[in-house]
Amino acid sequence: MSMTPREIVSELDAHIIGQNEAKRAVAIALRNRWRRMQLPEDLRQEVTPKNILMIGPTGVGKTEIARRLAKLANAPFIKVEATKFTEVGYVGKEVDSIIKDLTDVAVKLVKSQAVEKNRMRAQDAAEDRILDVLLPPAKDQWGNVQESDNSSTRQVFRKKLREGQLDDKEIEIDVAAQVSVEIMTPPGMEEMTSQLQSLFEGMSPNKTKKRKMKIKDALKVMVDEEAAKLVNPEELKQQAIEAVEQHGIVFIDEIDKICKKGEYSGGDVSREGVQRDLLPIIEGSTVNTKHGMVKTDHILFICSGAFQVARPSDLLPELQGRLPIRVELKSLTKEDFERILTEPNASLTLQYRELMKTEGVEIEFTKDGISKIAESAFRVNEKTENIGARRLHTVLERLMDGISFDASERSGEKIVIDEKYVQDALNDVVENEDLSRFIL
């Protein structure tokens, strides 16, 4: 069963501060995928996903929500930049490649799930192959394997193998030889490249080559080989296509960068042309991929953009209509910065503490020190460009510069980063607008 909206928001809260409206929107959209699958077949086809447009300044968590969502979804997920595409007929990536790449992701996902499902059987088969190398079965004069009475010896070796007692012993095994075919093609023809590679690799016979390696490494290689044998490629493709059609999620970032600006009337192959090409895919069409035909009717699209120069109304009206749910992400405050520095599971202050601990240096961030760091980042954002939480990275790097450089010579020391320490390290740069513009 899929996670509930409350559980999804709770997971996102562990990594992203604030932006509850955006978290709720993506949580509901994810849960609706599960709800739809519980409906009768005829009604299920009629329920289409409500695509989302996330609007907010840079550095407030739009892309981070996408990254974390990919891990939670357990479904085919791809994140693309809208600026990477050009209109059909021009040099560059076409919009159709989004669905082709999503299908490739789905094939890998379904394959890894199938391999995991068969791992126990594959493990047994791999152990048998290694035991055959360690205890070769006796053969008669015609080369046929004879029934041997070494089953008890075999069980002893199997026990040792499972306990790791034979891990460092070297053996020579036959492994599948990977045929690598490198093909150079002009930009925008990646699809043809992959098809030619598949063709040439399929023409080559299944060869094996002998390799010498430690038993623990050989076991991993053989488990993967045996698991791959237990998987039906055609069945995998069908499952992958179904996973894309029913559960696929596409996150399109920088959608504001393909808005038409001003009264420019010429052809615009990487802006309005891309919007026109996106329309049928988001609305629902069929895309031909190397794995088969994929319908996009029920793929969920989440678009995001800063919209600092353009506005959502600058998008094509038809595209606006296909993104019915609008979510606005708020600019971050000083209090948000303080929470970002301390609350997430892998907060910035924790990262620096652990990094310095590897050199034997103990770092302690006091409450007033964290408050001062947050205030400095907030002030620089106000005085120069507002780049959101990314400003914390530059401020902290500047603050920790001296410690990072000298840490290897200060093993055993404890350094307390309080308000005075931050004031002394950053005051000149924060107060001087010219310096903060170029350094922070």
From Swiss-Prot:
<feature type="binding site">
    <location>
        <begin position="59"/>
        <end position="64"/>
    </location>
    <ligand>
        <name>ATP</name>
    </ligand>
</feature>
<dbReference type="GO" id="GO:0016887">
    <property type="term" value="F:ATP hydrolysis activity"/>
</dbReference>
<dbReference type="GO" id="GO:0043335">
    <property type="term" value="P:protein unfolding"/>
</dbReference>
<protein>
    <recommendedName>
        <fullName>ATP-dependent protease ATPase subunit HslU</fullName>
    </recommendedName>
</protein>
<dbReference type="InterPro" id="IPR019489">
    <property type="entry name" value="Clp_ATPase_C"/>
</dbReference>
<dbReference type="GO" id="GO:0009376">
    <property type="term" value="C:HslUV protease complex"/>
</dbReference>
<keyword id="KW-0067">ATP-binding</keyword>
<comment type="function">
    <text>ATPase subunit of a proteasome-like degradation complex; this subunit has chaperone activity. The binding of ATP and its subsequent hydrolysis by HslU are essential for unfolding of protein substrates subsequently hydrolyzed by HslV. HslU recognizes the N-terminal part of its protein substrates and unfolds these before they are guided to HslV for hydrolysis.</text>
</comment>
<feature type="binding site">
    <location>
        <position position="390"/>
    </location>
    <ligand>
        <name>ATP</name>
    </ligand>
</feature>
<feature type="binding site">
    <location>
        <position position="253"/>
    </location>
    <ligand>
        <name>ATP</name>
    </ligand>
</feature>
<dbReference type="InterPro" id="IPR003959">
    <property type="entry name" value="ATPase_AAA_core"/>
</dbReference>
<comment type="similarity">
    <text>Belongs to the ClpX chaperone family. HslU subfamily.</text>
</comment>
<dbReference type="InterPro" id="IPR027417">
    <property type="entry name" value="P-loop_NTPase"/>
</dbReference>
<keyword id="KW-0963">Cytoplasm</keyword>
<dbReference type="Pfam" id="PF07724">
    <property type="entry name" value="AAA_2"/>
</dbReference>
<feature type="binding site">
    <location>
        <position position="17"/>
    </location>
    <ligand>
        <name>ATP</name>
    </ligand>
</feature>
<dbReference type="InterPro" id="IPR050052">
    <property type="entry name" value="ATP-dep_Clp_protease_ClpX"/>
</dbReference>
<feature type="binding site">
    <location>
        <position position="318"/>
    </location>
    <ligand>
        <name>ATP</name>
    </ligand>
</feature>
<dbReference type="Pfam" id="PF00004">
    <property type="entry name" value="AAA"/>
</dbReference>
<dbReference type="GO" id="GO:0008233">
    <property type="term" value="F:peptidase activity"/>
</dbReference>
<dbReference type="InterPro" id="IPR003593">
    <property type="entry name" value="AAA+_ATPase"/>
</dbReference>
<keyword id="KW-0143">Chaperone</keyword>
<dbReference type="GO" id="GO:0036402">
    <property type="term" value="F:proteasome-activating activity"/>
</dbReference>
<keyword id="KW-0547">Nucleotide-binding</keyword>
<dbReference type="InterPro" id="IPR004491">
    <property type="entry name" value="HslU"/>
</dbReference>
<comment type="subunit">
    <text>A double ring-shaped homohexamer of HslV is capped on each side by a ring-shaped HslU homohexamer. The assembly of the HslU/HslV complex is dependent on binding of ATP.</text>
</comment>
<dbReference type="GO" id="GO:0005524">
    <property type="term" value="F:ATP binding"/>
</dbReference>
<dbReference type="GO" id="GO:0051603">
    <property type="term" value="P:proteolysis involved in protein catabolic process"/>
</dbReference>
